[in-house]
Amino acid sequence: MTTNAETVAPNQQVEKKRLGFWIDLFRRLIREKPLGTFGLFVVILLFFTGIFANFIAPFPLNAVHLVDRLSPPSAKYLLGTDQLGTDVLSQLIYGARISMIIGVIGTLLSKLISTTIGVTSGFFGGKFDMIVQRFVDAFMAVPQLIVLMTIMSIIGNGMFQVILVLGITTGISSSRVIRSAVITIKSNMYVQAADAIGCGSIRTMTRHILPNIMATIIIDATIIMGAIILQEASLSFLGYGVPPDIPSWGSMLSLQGEKYMQQAPALALWPGFALSIVVYGINMFGDALRDLLDPRLRGGVGRYTLNNKNLKKLKKSLRNHQLAAKI
């Protein structure tokens, strides 16, 4: 019984430390990063809207009211209607669901690919790393929008196709970030010690490399998510994204805003505004996480440097440590 209690106690302490880390991170985000807090609010709002779109939207999906075509904002239609009489607010809400699904699944696929390429390339190095990086260089040399349009024209439109293409392309491009982090971690003594005692490559990568680059992966995932949402909107605007019957912010800009810009400019304003706010919020949240998780950048208040107040506290703390050392 004593052995079991002694075994359980350290595990509970580890769980408390992990929970305390995330609570402390959230508190520091609220206290030190106002733009990051705004970004977190935008991310939560996007997920909430996407999950509960059926309950939030005033009208069902693709509900048409031909009598009320191109109606201005009113009590019945808060943001007006489009050329078919479809409620614009409902389309925006259902479009948030599409952006959430494509953004989340595409980011997970992207991080799986980028982590696999980056970790193996950075860990093994040598000729393998050189061959992989030359392939990545060649891929990044071509404008990504052209690559996306070419692939989508071959495999056809569809949500699955968009997720697959965006996940693979962004994963290859962002593998450079993971590779750089792996090269930095690989030079540490504990990785070299693991190699010296005979740890296999798979064990070293999973036990010593991956846990120490999780901060980099999380930060990069937030940035990639914003990029994927923006690229999906670009593809849908050009006609290479999701089918027209699926509400998307990009297709709303293309099918409604472009054709009725003079007659009803709000049709382009609202999806463009929603897209801008979501991408901006996700990027601000990612920047705040980068500052909070990177020890070299800690201490800022919405910025990337130490402010005067925190700098004075740091100097005072250093003086106290120096005095204590002399005593």
Task: Tell me what each language-model feature is.
Residues M1-K111, T115, G126-K127, D245, ...:
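Gly/Trp-centered helix-boundary motif
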Residues F38-P60, G95, R134-N157, G167, ...:
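Membrane-water interface segments at the C-terminal ends of transmembrane alpha-helices
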Residues I44, A57, I113-I117, V147, ...:
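Hydrophobic/aromatic residues in alpha-helical transmembrane segments
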Residues L78, D82, V88, L112-S114, ...:
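Generic hydrophobic transmembrane alpha-helix motif, especially the helices
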Residues I98-S114, A141-M152, P211, A215-E232, ...:
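Hydrophobic alpha-helical transmembrane segments in multi-pass membrane proteins
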Residues I102-G106, S121, V136-D137, V165, ...:
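Alpha-helical transmembrane segments of multi-pass integral membrane proteins
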Residues I151-I154, G167, A181-V182, I223, ...:
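Glycine-rich helix-loop "coupling/hinge" segments at transmembrane-helix boundaries
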